[in-house]
Regions:
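A short coil-to-beta-strand element that immediately follows conserved catalytic motifs
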Residues: 70-79
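Short, solvent-exposed loop/turn segments that connect beta-strands within catalytic domains
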Residues: 21-26, 38, 88-91
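Conserved beta-strand segments that form the floor/walls of ligand-binding pockets within enzyme
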Residues: 12, 43, 75, 99-101
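Conserved N-terminal beta-strand and adjoining loop/helix that marks the start
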Residues: 1-28, 101
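Nudix hydrolase/Nudix homology domain
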Residues: 108-147
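A generic structural micro-feature
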Residues: 5-9, 41, 90-96, 115
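Active-site-adjacent beta-strand/loop module that shapes the phosphate/pyrophosphate-binding cleft
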Residues: 80-108
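Conserved Nudix-box catalytic region and its N-terminal flanking loop in Nudix hydrolases
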Residues: 25-66
Length: 147
């Protein structure tokens, strides 16, 4: 199924990868998108579900592909829609996204797949990023409920 100008919505997953080192230091991984939509913007690692793949398996796979980290899916944080209009009244992108709180359990942080960059951010650094759509809300929710 094509992502741009799809015939029906695509189901995707997002990984809110939180590392809680101690009570005072909690950080989250974000990627700088290397492809459309939202090219060049900071966002959650994630992508489209593959046929036959569970949601939790998809979030683990996408996290590994885009960040180099092996993660454990802890809990579902929410379901979100991302609609990006195109030309002539058509929907250019339409995603239904299921975001999960994830804990890093291995691997090395590195940008991969369609990520142009990847890094850890603290809560204090988030406002300056101008995160895409509802990503800021789900990141804050993940930071608040981390383990």
């Amino acid at each position: 199924m094509k992502r741009e100008y799809p015939e029906s919505p695509l189901v995707g997953v997002g990984a809110v990868i939180v590392d809680r080192r101690d009570r005072d230091e909690t950080r989250v991984v974000l990627i700088r998108r290397g492809t459309a939509p939202l090219l060049g913007e900071w966002s959650l690692p994630g992508g489209v579900l593959e046929c036959g793949e569970t949601l939790r398996a998809a979030v683990v796979r996408e996290a590994r592909e885009e960040t180099g980290l092996l993660v454990e899916s802890v809990e579902m944080l929410g379901v979100y829609e991302r609609l990006i209009p195109g030309d002539q009244g058509r929907m250019r992108y339409h995603f239904v996204l299921i975001d999960f709180l994830c804990r890093p359990v291995g691997g090395e942080l590195r940008a991969g797949s369609d990520a142009a960059d990847v890094r850890w951010f603290t809560r204090d650094e988030l406002p300056a990023l101008n995160l895409a759509y509802d990503a800021n809300d789900v990141v804050l929710k993940g930071l608040a409920s981390a383990y």
